């Protein structure tokens, strides 16, 4: 795909809307919606790269209460003809058709490659990738198991959502201290994952979230690893202008 002149591609991840409570996250949600409202002026494509919500589970006829401003703005942008792509994260992996049916937004459960202006973008949330994160990999197999999802669906939403919110805060899954530290290239497992991928095929950009830490790391071979940071502490996003990709900080006007 060639980006029209004057248009850009935007990337954001790790909003964790609803954490630690819906009331506490409302200012962050309003800031994110203001950003969406600004970028729609020149956006060719928008990528939401996981953990938009701190918890999301779609029942057969019910979705979580709240997030009206975000969902309404996404619907408006999608209806205007601007493509939006959504990658599930480890907090909102239980998508089941709502975004596709109501918002016309495709949802991806694993990394996917795109090409814009002859540059390749390898995009994913980042959870469970690379040589580490073994505990989460085991946990993800349980969470994505059809039997587990069926059993959870039979739990009353007030109970299920309450348990999920408690565990998220209790285990500091939002923005714990470990996520705020750069571990060095040799210990950043998403960097190692990207380098391993480069051994088989060249990509210009590897774009991930999950780490809650903005990073721009050159991998050699004219390839770059980008971590998008988050919308909890950093309010960072990626933007590709047709020639180069860079991280920026959103400062609301």
Predicted segment positions?
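Core catalytic region of metal-dependent phosphoesterases/phosphodiesterases
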Residues: 2-8, 12, 17-116, 233
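Conserved catalytic motifs of the protein kinase core domain
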Residues: 8, 45, 119, 204, ...
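Conserved histidine-centered catalytic loops in small-molecule metabolism enzymes
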Residues: 14, 252-253
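Low-complexity, flexible helical/coil segments
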Residues: 44-51, 81-87, 121-125, 143-151, ...
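N-terminal short leaders/motifs
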Residues: 54-77, 176-203
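Conserved beta-sheet core of the metallophosphoesterase superfamily
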Residues: 106-109, 122, 127, 133-139, ...
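Active-site-proximal loop/helix segment associated with metal-binding centers of metalloenzymes
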Residues: 126-189
């Amino acid at each position: 795909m060639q980006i029209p002149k004057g248009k850009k591609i935007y990337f954001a991840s790790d909003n964790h809307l609803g954490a630690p409570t819906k009331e506490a996250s409302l200012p962050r949600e309003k800031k994110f919606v203001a950003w969406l409202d600004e970028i729609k002026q020149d956006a060719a494509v928008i990528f939401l790269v996981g953990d938009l919500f701190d918890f999301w589970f779609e029942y057969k006829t019910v979705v979580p209460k709240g997030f009206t401003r975000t969902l309404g703005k996404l619907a408006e942008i999608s209806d205007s003809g601007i493509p939006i792509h959504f990658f599930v994260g480890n907090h909102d992996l239980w998508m089941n058709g709502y975004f596709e049916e109501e918002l016309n937004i495709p949802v991806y459960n694993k990394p996917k490659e795109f090409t814009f202006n002859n540059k390749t973008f390898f995009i994913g949330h980042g959870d469970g990738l690379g040589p580490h994160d073994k505990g989460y990999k085991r946990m993800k197999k349980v969470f994505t198991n059809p039997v587990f999802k069926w059993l959870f669906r039979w739990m009353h939403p007030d109970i299920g959502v309450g348990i999920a919110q408690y565990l998220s805060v209790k285990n500091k899954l939002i923005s714990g201290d470990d996520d705020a530290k750069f571990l060095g290239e040799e210990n950043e497992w998403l960097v190692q994952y990207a380098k391993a991928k480069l051994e088989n095929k060249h990509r210009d950009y590897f774009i991930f979230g999950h780490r809650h830490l903005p990073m721009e790391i050159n991998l050699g071979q004219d390839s770059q690893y980008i971590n998008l940071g988050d919308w909890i502490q950093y309010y960072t996003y990626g933007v590709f202008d047709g020639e180069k990709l860079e991280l920026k900080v959103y400062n609301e006007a």
